Amino acid sequence: MDLCNEKDIRALLGRHGFSKSMGQNFLIEGWVPRDIAEASGAGPDTGVLEIGPGIGPLTVQLARRAAKVAAIELDRTLYPILAETLAPYPNAEVVPGDAMKLDLAALVSDKFSGLTAIACANLPYNITTPVLTALIEAGCFASITVMIQREVALRICAAPGSSDYGAFSVFCQYHTQPELLFEVGPECFLPAPKVTSAVIRLVPRSAPPQNLVDDSFFFQVVRASFAQRRKTLLNGLSSAFGSRLSKDALRGAIEAAGLPADIRGERLGIPEFATLASALQNRL
């Protein structure tokens, strides 16, 4: 059975009583899950956490390479389908549940003892940001390789000053080194979505790019700086910190960080945000 063949997909769904697509976009180009699995670095010493396996095309490719695969799936209607498609792969296990509510670090510790843990998934577009955030914050993966909407991939990898650069860019780049690997066109899916997808790999940093006294405050400053993109950094910070610091104090913090008072938040890289956060914290 070819899980990327339209005829085989329809036959599989029919055997399990589904006449329609179940609201999913099925991969119909076999090179896509194969190349994603290859890019993930899955191998005989790795345990792979997958989120949202669908009918299992990526799961199968991962199971052929990795020592073990644990695929988190929330939709119970997919369990009998996955039981069939993964039957030849005893090293692949479906984990029932919501990835957003599970303790991912504990799950990895339980399932992948003695293995290098990596994450690999074709993520549903509507939960990309919270799932990626959870994977990064779990702090237990050697790499995270995911297919997501191209627009989000560009934001994650964006440089300061670009229109795609934002608070999520800073978050991902502070914790990881992201790399856009390749794009996947709408024609690779059935039905074809209206957007292009992209595969990215995020490798967690062994040490943060900046030494911060307070990570939480740093990201509070980052979010405030991007909250009103068309306004200056000073105005953005005023909205967030105006109840605690006067505009003159905020202006002084910006200048103490070596930044012009009229700069916009999207011009700042991680080092500048770190210096600014320190200057602000010294005035609180």
Model-assigned labels for residue ranges:
Residues 1-224, 252-255, 266, 275-282:
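Catalytic cores of RNA-modifying enzymes
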Residues 223-284:
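C-terminal lobe and adjacent flexible extensions of AdoMet/dcAdoMet transferase-like proteins
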